[in-house]
Amino acid sequence: MNKKFYITTLGCPKNTADSMSMHHSLLEEGFTPATFAEESDFHFINTCTFIQSATEETIQTILSAAQVKKQNHQKLVVVGCFAERYPDNISSEIPEVDLFFGTGRYAQAGKILREKFPDLSPPKREFNDSLLERLKLSSEIENYSKPYAYVKVSDGCNRGCSFCIIPSFRGKFRESPVEDILRDVDRAIRAGAKEICLVSQDTVYYGRNSEVLLDMVRKVAEIDSLEVLRLLYLYPDKKTEKLLRLMGETPKIAPYLESPLQHVSSKILKSMNRVGESSTFKDLFALAREVKPGLEIRTSFIIGYPGEEPGDVDQVLRFIEETRPEKVNLFSYSPQEGTKGAELKQTVSEKEKSRRINLIRDVHLAILEEIHESRIGQTYDAIVDSVENDQAVVRRFQDAPEMDEVVYVDDISLIPGMIGKIRIDSFYEYDMNGTWISK
């Protein structure tokens, strides 16, 4: 009895890592991955509810999947953050959902499915515990024809940011043992990954002290078969400074800093229950560029938080103009029930939030155009992500997969996972065109 599953993943790379864990569990229990949702017997939706727009996207995705379910006689399974946060709503308002479970149970997905639907479950996969069989299974599981993979180093968060609902359903910070991280990295590499992205809610919180964090990163970077190591979600504090110095000493670590500041106004940061201020953030960005030549920066800002005034927005604008981060993500603040921020008087209208975001975006786009101009004719280390529509999609080491710029190359002889040099020839608003100059 061949029963197929398909996983739709919403949200951030951390969810992608969780979906890979589900994939592993389902395959181990004898289920088979489907190429398309329509051909699956079980359609999983791994959800996101970080902000209001993410919640709305989740609901729409579930409702759309419910229509597909009716046409294809599937079982619809909703998992992750939305299921953890709104179980009663799913039960009462979306009867099309056959099964739901929250965060922390991804690795048991196969067993959960078998217990819920014993008559629809295939025979459990039989294999011995030899390393060879385990690695063979892992390769089958995690080869998504992508040259990169996400490996979670922890789950949960202890920061207590007043705008963030994640700790309420992800729980307190819990780190993975180094041995488990190394195992997952090795498994992904054996499945074909050339680049490993370490992810978590708060990567720099890992370890009892800075040395534990640095030792974990060193051990991952020392894996001979690893080509590129990328560190994501680096909270802007002192441990990040030490991690940056390690990045400068370690060629395998990508020239990339992702550090979500969320704001630069001291008043707003204090209300958000976050540390740091504009001057320390400037020093952090300057240090990153000093120790890792060619490094590019990705950061994010939440605009329209309660109490934000025009002067606070001006501080964000000045910061962007002075530090010139290559990648800026802007979120419109949406109060999340159960957070401290939701208890504050909402002082900024939705219309004004949009105006402020558009103002900041326009300033950054003007800076980005100048940055693009400086890239013309320059060569960069790069990796081929895919070949589609008679073009290769290539990514510089300065760009993270699935969220940053890509470079389009008119060369279908390139192969996903190939690493070499690319020359930038032209650009769009965000993405670029280029020429592959070494294989």
Curated annotation (Swiss-Prot):
Reactions it catalyzes: L-aspartate(89)-[ribosomal protein uS12]-hydrogen + (sulfur carrier)-SH + AH2 + 2 S-adenosyl-L-methionine = 3-methylsulfanyl-L-aspartate(89)-[ribosomal protein uS12]-hydrogen + (sulfur carrier)-H + 5'-deoxyadenosine + L-methionine + A + S-adenosyl-L-homocysteine + 2 H(+)
Cofactor binding comment, as recorded: Binds 2 [4Fe-4S] clusters. One cluster is coordinated with 3 cysteines and an exchangeable S-adenosyl-L-methionine.
Annotated ranges, domain Radical SAM core: 143-370
Residue span(s) of domain MTTase N-terminal: 3-118
Gene Ontology CC terms, in alphabetical order: cytosol
Binding site for [4Fe-4S] cluster 1: C12, C48, C81
Leader sequence segment: none
Pfam families (alphabetical): Radical_SAM (PF04055), TRAM_2 (PF18693), UPF0004 (PF00919)
Gene3D superfamilies the record matches: Methylthiotransferase, N-terminal domain (3.40.50.12160), Nucleic acid-binding proteins (2.40.50.140), tm_1862 like domain (3.80.30.20)
Keywords, sorted A to Z: 4Fe-4S, Cytoplasm, Iron, Iron-sulfur, Metal-binding, S-adenosyl-L-methionine, Transferase
Primary location class: cytoplasm
Top-level taxon: Bacteria
Swiss-Prot/TrEMBL GO biological process terms: tRNA modification
Domain TRAM: from-to ranges: 373-438
InterPro entries xrefs: Elp3/MiaA/NifB-like_rSAM, Methylthiotransferase, Methylthiotransferase_CS, Methylthiotransferase_N, Methylthiotransferase_N_sf, NA-bd_OB-fold, Ribosomal_uS12_MeSTrfase_RimO, rSAM
Listed EC numbers: 2.8.4.4
Transmembrane segments annotated in the record for this chain: none
Family statement: Belongs to the methylthiotransferase family. RimO subfamily.
Name of the protein this chain belongs to: Ribosomal protein uS12 methylthiotransferase RimO
Gene name of this polypeptide: rimO
